[in-house]
């Protein structure tokens, strides 16, 4: 992050501490910053040399508020939020249901003045984006806010984009887009002159037609819209690039070239989904997804099926999934077999611990290419990069960086992934990059993709065992997976009675 961006983040975030004493959470504060920065930017755009129509009604602009103090400021801010919530497009989506949560008027005044001092429009989109991303990260670092679940490590996002290598005038979806991190990384990749020299129509497509997102949580949805707008994605009056809602409820109808996503971690969905061939118990609340391969209450498994639906026949996906997706029985096994049959599930990246804000998370990235319908099995081999064994990061003292993922990207060989070379061999058993034939995988119990071969040195070192929370998380995950497998077996036995 640049020094300018870092200084602004520190100043703006410094005002949050006294607000905490008034019961204002980091998330609430960030939401208020979203509203205020948007108002200030809109005011700047309405003036020379831009003179842009902002859509904000007269009497409800930044300049109608920024000189006020005390109760007058509070009342005017409240009136602006209520009025703009009734507007259309991105404007209305950002301000819908907005209320002032900074009841301390002296701090509200200080925040307004701090934002007023900066010329946001004259900043490059990189600087604006850095500032907002910095604020999002501050929010994610707050354990109590729970916002870390929406925050995928940026080095991982960039590596996933680098491997997929999205092309101009192609569409990209994220069905649980959080604050929009995958979209911003894809935009940066596409706009980088080292990758492509975009012409005018390609730039316009990148801004208005490339991205399709869905986000369930209202506050996060608003943060995402603001984040995209600050990075020049979307338009005040054009198509809103992100919809609010549960992506799993139905087939959205669109088909895209790429999916980049990190579905929310968590074992169960509150709704059981069924495909066209499965029966349900009467008490279940059911959404009939005829496009799904099988029924599951596991959110990650449902997202994989949803991603398969929204991909074009030649589409490509990179998806972060927890370990249980790779080894769980029942629906998990059915979905793994379907992926191997109907897509080219060519790569798995085993992720290290300590990179997510939720402690003890063990995750992977699966890369698969959809294929047109064919009687032949589409996956011939699966390449696995073990970036977990004997690797550990922490969020503060030893965070994962872009450089840490360069070896994986080189092994992946994005320019032509069919020209790959294993680093593992009988002579080099410590190699992290290894190929497995699909026949080897199909012979494994439950078609498990949870494959590792490196010796875990921490298990041999009793003084360097994993942290207790990691061990506890492992035990809980294994017990939950076993319980779900037994539950599915019991349900199947009931149906057969």
PLM regions: where:
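Conserved S-adenosyl-L-methionine
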Residues: 146-261, 265-279, 289-291, 301, ...
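Non-catalytic, mostly N-terminal accessory regions of nucleic-acid modification and defense proteins
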Residues: 1-168, 232, 236-247, 350-353, ...
